Amino acid sequence: MTLIKEDVLNGRKLELYQQNSLPEWGYEKPQTDTFAIYYPKDYDPEKSYPLWVVFHSAGHDVYSTIECIKEEGNHDIYHVVDDAFGLILDCRANTQGTTDWWWGGASAQADLSDPEVIKKRSIETQPVEKRCIATVLDTMAKYPIDENRVYACGNSMGGSGSLGIALSRGDIFAGIKANVPAGVRHAADRCCLDLEAPEGFKIPDPPIVVDYSAQNDGWSDGHEVLYDGMNAKKYLLMGFWGAFGHANNHAQIAKYNDLIHSFDLFGVKKNEAYPAFTNASTNDPLPWPSDRDSKAAGQVNAFFRWEVIKDEENEFEITLRLINESDWQTRVELPKESTADVTMRRLQNFKPNDGDEIAWEYGDAKGNVTCKDGIFTVEKLAITQSGCILKFNK
């Protein structure tokens, strides 16, 4: 990579780099791309920082994304919190004769019979995806990044790209936040959310996903694939919707659904276990695919919170609870109780083998579950605002 410019943006250092393609990325012809590094506000080289990886929309490139960051309310998802590094990627510079556009995936409105689209639709990553991952890893090596706090984000096409590139890379990304992603096909194809997986196919425990989309946005077509697939695979999706169209301004979106930013994604760490909630009784009915005229706001899994207490070789404990009014001010009537299935992900030390029987306790309830394919699930736990400790023993 070559440093081509240094600047200051909002009182924070900004660096622009160019990179030449590497043979292992698989491009048919050599190309040069640009990316930007945005420093924390009060940068201290002795500290380590989270990394916010930004995937731009179809209306932007790396340069115009930087311009958005200058103005509050302009594509708020691009804005990097003060105490984090930002990595702004680009897929616009080389769209002719490559699959770079749409970050290597299929859009919500793509013709799935198009040969150019078909060649993107598998578990195999495209050159642009390899380039993005390599750039993330290079950034982590060059700058003081906390390797357990790397997050992907994007708007529209970039929302599709962040899901498509990061969901299968739970070995790198702690979480994903997608604003009105213009398609979920990319993620579904790479992670086999609705397709039969090839024999032996497996991805690392995935990042936690926060997705907020609008049922009256044509670019949200197919969103049921993400919701149904994540639930079936027992991956954690915190999903939000409302009739806010293809919006990118947090304040405007909050007029329709003010729960969206209630979950602190920066609190998620790659090296910490988390519970994947599925089949929750408090989930709202999805507007996709058949209720797109609905004006109702809704959510899936938005009310759950947790805290890991113990993650040891033979014991694991975690507190499960629901959010309350002291956590987040909202127009929504917060539930006092929700029933959900709970699957543990990203266990660090408590790692049973397939076939192992695991004893669990949750308040007065207890039982046994069997580990299968590296995971185990306790069904229909009643989770309340006051919280309760879920315990596992080998």
List where the protein language model places each region:
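A domain-start/cap signature at the N-terminus of enzymes
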Residues: 1-51, 228, 365-366, 372-375
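Alpha/beta-hydrolase-fold serine-hydrolase catalytic core, especially in secreted/extracellular enzymes
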Residues: 5, 10, 23, 32, ...
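Short beta-strand-to-loop junctions in surface cap/lid or active-site-entrance loops
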Residues: 33-48, 57-60, 64-76, 201-202
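The feature captures the conserved acid-bearing segment of alpha/beta-hydrolase catalytic domains
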Residues: 43, 175, 181-271
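Gly/Ser-rich "nucleophile elbow"/oxyanion-hole loop immediately N-terminal to the catalytic nucleophile
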Residues: 46, 111-156, 167, 172
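Alpha/beta-hydrolase
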Residues: 53-55, 179
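Active-site machinery of serine-nucleophile hydrolases
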Residues: 58-135
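Primarily recognizes the serine-hydrolase "nucleophile elbow" in alpha/beta-hydrolase
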Residues: 147-197
